[in-house]
Amino acid sequence: MRKLKRWQIPFFAFASFGPCMLSTIISVYLVDALQTAGFGANLEQWTFAGKTIVAVGLFSVMKAISSLMDGLVEVPVATFVQNLKTPWGRRRPAILVGTIVMTLAYVLFCFPISYEENSAANSIWCGILLTVFVSFFTLAINALFGTYAEITANDDDRLLLTNIKAAFDTIQYSIAYALIPVFIGFGINIRQIGLYMAPLSLTILFAVFLIKENSTMPGAVAKYGDNVGATVEEETVSMMDGIKMSLGNEAFRAWLIIHGCFNLGLQMFLSGQNVLISGPMGLNGFQIAIINSSAFAPVPLMLIFYRKVMAKKGYRFAFQTALASFALGMVCMSLAYVRLFPDAMIRMALGATGGVICSYGIGAFFSAPTAMPTQIAADEKKRTGKSHPSMYFAMQGIVNSLVSAIGPGLIWVNLRNVSLNGNDMFGTHAMTYIVIAFCVLAIFACKLLPKEYDQLGRKEKAAKK
């Protein structure tokens, strides 16, 4: 594979912007838009029809199945991509097919079969489309992220790529969490907004045009890399060998535990954020935009601060501080509760304060899930000569799928319907405390990382070398 030039890295980092935006919108907004539970202000705009058009129990099962299916296809997809034989290489065909199918499923999700209340047909229809979406999103993104370790020339370029991607992730989430509530406040329905966003999947074309990979067909001659003109020798890796290789890495095993802990809480929060702010916090579209802007606007600066902490204290300590900041921000948001503070200005101030505190953790959360598997895969290639980055992302993806099935899929879908003593927003408000608990668990799980992660990223170490 031809290495990226320095000026090409920002464009390559931007490639995942559109597909990830669609994934955020469908998981955070469109799935919630099928039912009314937990919403307060702007109910007609936040939902497809101002009423619950799915059978909640059945749809929660279908949503959990979609998350589990996503996990089940992770490893087969990684193996398929790793061993794909085409004249255009392994990555580009997988990226294109995955993006086209996921975009079609996304658009169809915006068109329920009917607008009847508690519809079983809608539950099945939307559940199937959600399964198709997440499966082919996995194919496209696994193939794309699998190039990160191979398409960069050195560790500095790799770090630059993941940092720029984290910055684009910040913009993506700012649009999703800050601007979309503004559009809702203007009276635009979430279904329309979702359809307007669909063409963003075209950003994947940056990767399609920038990836220059040798043919993987038998007997093909290399056009790129260190052996131009020689016959391409592609290593075939079985599914079991790929699993053993990834799970045999001590640092990666520890990372999976950490990632699973904090990501369960994070996904619950991101999936239910609009319901939390609209319901228990009792804020409207413009106020929601302020809260979300306070959480995402400072992220680029917080990433710089995060890197400074890492340069002084190492990766483990820096990531623990990020987890602690997110938990503290959740405490502030839990206090911004209509039953505690009837004054909307006080609630908005508490929510904005919590958002700013959370932004430090958000910056780290954007960077780490791409940086860690990429770096581990690159280190493995240096150590063993074998390159199987897709499998690391696949195993991390399985953890993502499991926590999605447990957190947003089962806990959140049902928790938001829990009431206590006539308080219909009790379950939605309780979500903040669950997020805090999982952040604390992740802080302790960081101790499982190998000792060298106390030194990873420290400038003193680099200076000695």
Residue ranges and their predicted role:
Residues 2-465:
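Membrane-embedded alpha-helical bundles of multi-pass transporters/translocases
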